[in-house]
Amino acid sequence: MKITQEEVTHVANLSKLRFSEEETAAFATTLSKIVDMVELLGEVDTTGVAPTTTMADRKTVLRPDVAEEGTDRDRLFKNVPEQDNYYIKVPAILDDGGDA
């Protein structure tokens, strides 16, 4: 699957990143090769092969999911430089509100 320079530029703009034309072309080529390799892997016959999630022989240890009392909201907001009705206000980072 060919990734175009326009697609790379579009995603870069959404991420607020800027690349030169040479970098954009290189990313498009590299990403196209990666997608092609993933598509090729999808064609491999894995019939009879057990699913593998890790090569390490370890078990995940999880703590019990127990609800605990949180920090008192008023106490927490004493350290907040700017707030509005218990919402923490932070500086805007998107010029026009973004595409999100």
Curated annotation (Swiss-Prot):
Name of the protein described by the UniProt record: Glutamyl-tRNA(Gln) amidotransferase subunit C
Molecular function GO labels: asparaginyl-tRNA synthase (glutamine-hydrolyzing) activity; ATP binding; glutaminyl-tRNA synthase (glutamine-hydrolyzing) activity
Chain's gene name: gatC
Family: Belongs to the GatC family.
Known partners and oligomeric status: Heterotrimer of A, B and C subunits.
Catalytic reaction equation(s): L-glutamyl-tRNA(Gln) + L-glutamine + ATP + H2O = L-glutaminyl-tRNA(Gln) + L-glutamate + ADP + phosphate + H(+); L-aspartyl-tRNA(Asn) + L-glutamine + ATP + H2O = L-asparaginyl-tRNA(Asn) + L-glutamate + ADP + phosphate + 2 H(+)
Alphabetical keyword list: ATP-binding, Ligase, Nucleotide-binding, Protein biosynthesis
Keyword Phosphoprotein tagged: no
Taxonomic placement: Bacteria, Bacillati, Bacillota, Bacilli, Lactobacillales
BP-aspect Gene Ontology terms: glutaminyl-tRNAGln biosynthesis via transamidation; regulation of translational fidelity; translation
UniProt key word RNA-binding: no
Enzymatic class: ligase
Function noted in UniProt: Allows the formation of correctly charged Asn-tRNA(Asn) or Gln-tRNA(Gln) through the transamidation of misacylated Asp-tRNA(Asn) or Glu-tRNA(Gln) in organisms which lack either or both of asparaginyl-tRNA or glutaminyl-tRNA synthetases. The reaction takes place in the presence of glutamine and ATP through an activated phospho-Asp-tRNA(Asn) or phospho-Glu-tRNA(Gln).
EC number: 6.3.5.-
